[in-house]
Curated annotation (Swiss-Prot):
Pfam families: DcuA_DcuB (PF03605). Interacts with DcuS. DcuB/DcuS complexes are present both in the absence or presence of fumarate. Disruption phenotype: The growth the dcuA-dcuB double mutant is severely impaired during anaerobic growth with glycerol plus either fumarate, malate or aspartate, whereas single mutants are either unaffected or less affected, depending on the C4-dicarboxylate. The triple mutant dcuA-dcuB-dcuC is completely devoid of C4-dicarboxylate transport (exchange and uptake) during anaerobic growth, and the bacteria are no longer capable of growth by fumarate respiration. Deletion or inactivation of the gene causes constitutive expression of DcuS/DcuR-regulated genes in the absence of C4-dicarboxylates. The chain crosses the membrane at residues 1-18, 23-39, 54-70, 179-194, 235-252, 269-287, 314-331, 342-365, 426-443. The lineage of its organism: Bacteria, Pseudomonadati, Pseudomonadota, Gammaproteobacteria, Enterobacterales. Bifunctional protein with a transport and a regulatory function. Responsible for the transport of C4-dicarboxylates during anaerobic growth. Catalyzes the uptake of fumarate, malate, aspartate or D-tartrate coupled to the export of succinate. Can also catalyze the uptake (without exchange) of fumarate. May function primarily as a C4-dicarboxylate transporter during fumarate respiration. Required for anaerobic growth on D-tartrate. In addition, possesses a regulatory function, which is independent from the transport function, and is required for the response of the DcuS/DcuR two-component system to C4-dicarboxylates. DcuB interacts physically with DcuS and converts DcuS to the C4-dicarboxylate responsive form. However, the site for C4-dicarboxylate perception and specificity in sensing by DcuB/DcuS is located on DcuS and not on DcuB. One of its GO terms (molecular function) is succinate:fumarate antiporter activity. This is Anaerobic C4-dicarboxylate transporter DcuB. It comes from Escherichia coli (strain K12). It is a multi-pass membrane protein. Active under anaerobic conditions. Belongs to the DcuA/DcuB transporter (TC 2.A.13.1) family. Induction: Expression is highly regulated. Expressed exclusively under anaerobic conditions in a manner that is largely FNR dependent. Strongly induced by C4-dicarboxylates anaerobically. Expression in response to C4-dicarboxylates is controlled via the DcuS-DcuR two-component system. Repressed by NarL in the presence of nitrate and is subject to CRP-mediated catabolite repression. Residues 19-22, 71-87, 195-234, 288-313, 366-425 are cytoplasmic. InterPro entries: Anaer_Dcu_memb_transpt.
Length: 446
């Protein structure tokens, strides 16, 4: 009975925090914590300090990249690619947004490219919903495939002491599973999007809308472009510093002999990532003369700090509650998950929707899953399931896609659940999880 009451308290905090949005999600964890500790006298769990430190380092480097103009270079290259292949925008666009996320570690880079995707689609009489919805989904799917994303480094940190038949999960082991499985999922989204919805010339509602001259001008109006901008060399230098750091981190992750050893053990990749991300930010500031004051004012830094508070409050609250009832949870869920391993992926997917964060969902669920005996291989194979907040169209990138689509084809349906993102999201995540299991088996984890 007490467990049920405490679980309801946690769910109320999650629902209300998600509804308020932003930093409120993590702060609401504080309410749950105080009630659990001072009212129910549960011993406080341990906050995920390692995960939070990694997030701080990665966000600092990514925000510095944006402040330096290095991100503009990536976006300019992406726009050139899209405008050279307009007929294939429904397939190319989600790959572009996913790649940007993989390189930058955050899906928030999609906001700048969405108007360009719309312009390419509408000027070629392609239903904008096709590439717009796919691109928003693709940007978020890329998070679990990025070597510098909060979700990936968090998962590596949480699985750092876990062995798979005597073998530790290395940084590149995880990426070797998540990158190809994610890209195959993106391909599935692109193929689906190619055929979805009515062509614009057969869409009676759209044709009626543009029959009004003002509406037609609004729908087919010009969009801002990066192609006519000559970016300074410092922007290019910042981009190469950032990409070079990612390459070095990947190399150190691939070969533990390249890392210094202490007590017979190579330096943890969790610490390596922190060190090199801080180094990256410092080099960009020094070599490109980026104004440090501008770093804390951009979208990447803001969203990253919100992620830290979310992981802090939610994961600490969940650890406190589930840690106190671990024996009961093991008894109820342990056998079920062993018999139906896919149940873990469904739980992770739903929690992700509640918290609107892949990193926060992993931080809340992975420690519990390990404690009740879920095979770590299942956790790795099902990693793409940490993206579930496409289920309802409340995430900022989805809302942005709707706003940037002036044709109105990217939309939220009458029943809310029948929106433009639900099918691409289900297809992409499901296909990625299936291939995640296949690649995990190929590499000997399953």
């Amino acid at each position: 009975m007490l467990f049920t009451i405490q679980l309801i308290i946690i769910l109320i905090c999650l629902f209300y925090g998600a509804r308020k949005g932003g930093i409120a999600l993590g702060l609401l964890g504080g309410i749950g914590l105080v009630i659990l500790v001072f009212v129910f006298h549960l011993q406080p769990g341990k906050p995920p300090v390692d995960v939070m430190l990694v997030i701080i380092a990665v966000v600092a480097a990514s925000a510095t990249l944006q402040a330096s103009g290095g991100l503009d270079v990536m976006l300019q290259i992406a726009e050139k690619l899209l405008r050279r292949n307009p007929k294939y925008v429904s397939i190319v666009a989600p790959f572009v947004t996913c790649t940007l996320t993989i390189l930058c570690g955050t899906g928030h880079v999609v906001y700048t490219i969405l108007p360009i995707i719309y312009d390419v689609a509408i000027k070629n009489n392609i239903r904008p919903e096709r590439p717009m919805a796919a691109s928003s989904i693709g940007a978020q799917m890329g998070i679990i495939a990025s070597p510098v994303s909060v979700a990936v480094v968090s998962l590596v940190a949480m699985l750092g002491n876990v062995t798979f038949d005597g073998r530790h999960l290395e940084f590149l082991d995880l990426l070797a599973i998540t990158i190809p499985s994610t890209l195959i999922g993106i391909l599935a989204i692109g193929i689906f999007s190619w055929f979805r919805g009515k062509d614009l010339d057969k869409d009676e509602e759209f044709q009626k809308f543009i029959s009004v001259p003002e509406n037609r001008e609004y729908v087919y109006g010009d969009t801002a472009t990066l192609l006519d901008k000559k970016l300074p060399k410092s922007n290019w230098l910042a981009m190469w510093i950032f990409l070079g750091a990612i390459a070095v981190v990947a190399l150190l992750g691939a070969d533990s002999d390249l890392r210094p050893s202490f007590g017979g053990k190579p330096l943890s990749m969790v610490l390596v990532i922190q060190m090199f991300m801080l180094l990256t930010g410092a080099l960009i500031i020094i070599l490109t003369k980026t104004n440090p004051a501008s770093i804390s004012k951009n979208e990447v830094f803001r969203s990253g700090m919100i992620a830290i508070v979310a992981v802090y409050g939610i994961a600490w609250m969940a650890e406190t509650m589930f840690g106190a009832h671990m024996s009961e949870i093991q008894g109820v869920l342990g056998e079920m998950v062993k018999e139906y391993p896919w149940a873990y992926a469904i739980v992770l997917l739903l929690v992700s929707k509640f918290v609107n964060s892949q990193a926060a969902a992993l931080a809340a669920i992975v420690p519990v899953a390990l404690a009740i005996g879920v095979d770590p291989a299942y956790i790795v194979a099902s990693a793409p399931a940490c993206y579930g907040y496409y289920i309802l169209p409340t995430y900022p990138s989805d809302l942005a896609a709707i706003q940037f689509d002036r044709s109105g084809t990217t939309h939220i349906g009458r029943f809310v659940i029948n929106h433009s993102f639900i099918l691409p999201g289900l297809i992409g995540v499901s296909v990625s999880c299936v291939f995640g299991w296949i690649f995990a088996a190929m590499y000997g984890f399953l």
